[in-house]
Amino acid sequence: TVRDVATVMQRKEMIRRITSEITEYLEELGSEGRLLALQVEDLVRGSASERALVMRDYIANPDDLARVEAELSSLGSERIVDLTAISNILGLDVYEVADLDREITPRGVRALSLVPHLSWSAIKVVSAHFNSLPQLRAATVEDLEELEGIGPYRAKLITENLAHQAQAVSAGIVGW
């Protein structure tokens, strides 16, 4: 739902802010904060890239990524807890609280990012063409081969990986 996406983005933004603040304190500690700096790095590893992938999966206009990042970063402490504000920054058109319960479909960017040996440019081409994860999962090898930069090897790799991911989800192995 829109609420789920907004909540994930809210948490990712809070993690980004807390990490930034802790990093400032660690810089003041100098060499005495080295161990703590390593622990913080371990805790937040991958959080920034996950944040960007979730944004790319759900923002209304993928070309607005820089604007969305800037607006989320500039939200004040009182507005970061407002899921409606976060949803609207993402371009998800939330006008009342009930709109937060609307179903929303990802583009498939995160799913494609899990396909080994798939370049970012290929991910952009495929996700822009298919617009949603269900459309992407329904694509055949032939459909994918028609896209620029996606040959038979990549097309087969994508379809096999997406099928494997779908099986893992339906089997309850992963929760997304």
Where are these regions (language model features)?
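Long, highly charged, low-complexity intrinsically disordered interaction regions
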Residues: 2-146, 152-176
